[in-house]
Amino acid sequence: MAIYMSTICFGSIECKLPYSPASCGHVTEEREVLASVEPFMDLEAQLSARLLRQKHATVRVLKNGTCAYRYKTDAQIVRIQKKLERKERDEYHFQMAAPSIVSKITIAGGDPPSKYEPQTPKRVIHTTPRVRKVKKHSIIKLTESQMNHLIKQVKRIMSAKKGSVHLINKKSTHVQYKEILGTTRAAVRTAHMMGLRRRVDFRCDMWTTERLKCLARTDKWSNRVHTINIRKGDSGVILNADSLKGHFGRSSGGLFIVRGSHEGKLYDARSKVTQGVLNSMVQFSNAENFWKGLDDNWARMRYPSDHTCIDGLPVEDCGRVAALMTHSILPCYEITCPTCAQQYANLPASDLFKLLHKHARDGLSRLGSDKDRFVHVNKFLVALEHLTEPVDLNLELFNEIFKSIGEKQQAPFKNLNVLNNFFLKGKENTAHEWQVAQLSLLELARFQKNRTDNIKKGDISFFRNKLSAKANWNLYLSCDNQLDKNANFLWGQREYHAKRFFSNFFEEVDPAKGYSAYEIRKHPNGTRKLSIGNLVVPLDLAEFRQKMKGDYRKQPGVSKRCTSSKDGNYVYPCCCTTLDDGSAIESTFYPPTKKHLVIGNSGDQKYVDLPKGDSEMLYIAKQGYCYINVFLAMLINVSEEDAKDFTKKVRDMCVPKLGTWPTMMDLATTCAQMRIFYPDVHDAELPRILVDHDTQTCHVVDSFGSQTTGYHILKASSVSQLILFANDELESEIKHYRVGGVPNACPELGSTISPFREGGVIMSESAALKLLLKGIFRPKVMRQLLLDEPHLLILSILSPGILMAMYNNGIFELAVRLWINEKQSIAMIASLLSALALRVSAAETLVAQRIIIDAA
């Protein structure tokens, strides 16, 4: 046996091993090699039909939210495939076609049809034109679908408001929506509901039946209703015959109109019953329950009588008088309506008295000739009319008395206030309040009897009101971050918004006219000369000293009109200043300045650089507009964030109210209003105010000083002191003096092109109202209006219709959302207007109810 060597490698090591081949012979055998098979080929062939159906299927959503395939039929799939093949074939032929230019399009290569039409020449027909134009009224015709849509919309509206619908064909059918069986359902008026007992309780034709079926399809129409759940008061209700369960009779048209029951079986009102069934049938009307409750409680609740009662009055007339009394005392549209009862209970006492008075008077007129038979009813209604007769209360007198002595609680003013309140309440006073009023009247009688003399007033010769030599310390002018490197006040954003004052209430000084054209300031009772001419400084010292003397104007001495008092005590900030000897301090020459605002009344005056206008020219207040310097001085104490709103309020709210040459009291009142919105202005320093008793005028000194001298000087130096004039109880002549006002010719204050542009001028009331109406129906305009001019919301109180439209469109809610985090005062205004709209809506409901009751 031969031995061979075999080599085996382990990495880089070779091993040689001997071996001997087998002694058996070689056998040759062919092995069958299986061909490679695609494992998913059979699966794809099996699923090809399913995948083809899913390819053309659409997806639909079931009621439970599950998505499922909606498969096409075999015929639809064949049509879809043929359409796709035809589209691919046409696209292939189009792509492979030779390029060509289309220059003409014809019908089958022929001429257009218009070429073969005979052309008849047009000739003029000479006729007399008709003067009267005939109006052709088109007949409105509705298709079946439009008619069904109209009925559905009417049904939706009436079911929501519990209204009624009348179907008119050959006869009228009244359909009323009521709350029955836990939902709103339609009900018809049957014969037994009107007191008639007939074998057929309700008749209607096929057209009415179809319309009733449409009107009765309200919410829960398909819900199951069992006959045992139907009770008294459900007569005439229209039910779904397919969803009705229990023992009931025949019906038609898919409707079941409830009539009554007999031996446990419910009957349709359209069914014809026998006379025996009619006599023993239990009708489902509320009338039987009403009479049952009346009969059961009449004998139990009646009072004992001292005579033997007889039947002397007709029963029908007694029923009519009972209805008359019910509507006179407890008016309602339906006696079973809880809403009518709640509205009656919610009436204020004054409104209830007015309602009873009117209904008692109507009851007397309705009683008519029967008052001789029903004398007790007539006497009761006469007494009720007299007791509830409204008293004509004059609120103006009450307000006048309250403003005069309302805050005084010492005698005899306390007793007068008690009587004032007593007369205001009128017939609503209780027995205790009558007793208190009589005691107050007794105290007043004793006081008047024992009074012998008035309290002696103090002598004006002892009046002193010295002007402090110390200057007021202004925080805003002393803060480092409000000053520049030269210690001048920085206006910041206030300078930009102050342009609303300069563009509307100031005018540029024209150098061509000269300073002399602006020296005379006119007011209603005279003139005052400014020292603007002294801006041209003479170099001659004697001439300069002569100009500094001014023009002296003699004023009367210190008298009662120089003072202001309250409760017998002087209010010194509202009085003229005096020297130590009691004589008045007279104003001296005030030199002019160039582009400065002069503030401060005590000590040294403060000079603040004026905000820059649109040009580098000098600015002077328009004639009669000097008081605008008060608001310009208040702007110093307003933060930069509120400067825009402040200037707009002054422009749009204060100036229109002040009018031409307002009184000092009106100016103080507007300052008090602005202090509520911007509390920081309470200590704002004012320009010096000069008092001219001869012309009864207060002059606000501006940057151009005053050439006229001799005026008295008002002590008020801050806004909080000026506000003291806004008091009706302040005894002062100065508060009625004129200060300044709107010029006669200022056309740019009438309207504005763009109410949203920065620095836009004031709008008139009509223009602002038109803009507000425009914003109601344009949300973008209203949103911008709320951001720029939110106080225009207050104009909505001019009309209840505007107020309700803004409330229904959610404008007040939008205003609250926009301003609740920015300025709560505006959000509060929007909330108050929203609450007012709710009260207007309730008032309209009460008026509508009263009209319905009067018409009943």
UniProtKB/Swiss-Prot annotation:
It comes from the Viruses. It is an enzyme of class 3 (hydrolase). The lineage of its organism: Viruses, Riboviria, Orthornavirae, Pisuviricota, Stelpaviricetes. This is Genome polyprotein. The active site is at 192 (for p1 proteinase activity), 201 (for p1 proteinase activity), 235 (for p1 proteinase activity), 626 (for helper component proteinase activity), 699 (for helper component proteinase activity). Keywords: Host-virus interaction, Hydrolase, Inhibition of host innate immune response by virus, Protease, Serine protease, Suppressor of RNA silencing, Thiol protease, Viral immunoevasion. GO terms for biological process: proteolysis; symbiont-mediated suppression of host innate immune response. The keyword Hydrolase applies. Residues 618-740 form the Peptidase C6 domain. It holds the Pfam family Potyvirid-P3.
